[in-house]
Amino acid sequence: MPAEPDPAADTSKVPGTFKAFVSKFPALADAHEQIAQAVDAVGPLDHRICQLIKIGISMGAGLESATRSHVRRACEAGATPAEIEQAILLGMNTVGFPRTVAAWSWAQTQFERDRQEGNGGMA
């Protein structure tokens, strides 16, 4: 399936640390983006499903910023808050209750940020 345009290209929504890294190492950032697009395009999963999976991977690794980024991207790809919450809850028996609750709270933070920025449709 062809890669869809990356909503992360809107740099107003990415963390300052990431912006600084991209500014200092643009070739690495470009390579990272090319790999991400190639991986998304290599199989039959659509962008929405890929983002839901990436939420699970990010939460399993305990990566708050990445989890919130993929929550935002999943919403932009059409995922509902209920779908995002289910993606998080699916990890409970694998990564444990505390990490699941932490990831759920990170998603709530992102939903609230999106509401404040006028990106309706959040939980």
Regions found by a protein language model. Give the residues of each.
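Mid-chain, well-packed structural core segment of small domains
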Residues: 60-89
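C-terminal structural segments of small proteins and small subunits
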Residues: 85-110
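Short alpha-helical linear motifs
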Residues: 72-79, 95, 106-115
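Aromatic- and histidine-enriched alpha-helix N-cap/loop-to-helix transition segments
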Residues: 47-48, 82, 95
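Residues at alpha-helix boundaries and short interhelical turns
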Residues: 22, 43, 60-64, 78, ...
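A general alpha-helix detector
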Residues: 17, 34-35, 52, 69-73, ...
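Short alpha-helical scaffolding segments that buttress acidic/His motifs in well-ordered protein cores
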Residues: 32, 52-59, 87-94
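Acidic, glycine/proline-rich low-complexity segments that act as flexible tails and inter-domain linkers
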Residues: 1-49, 103-123
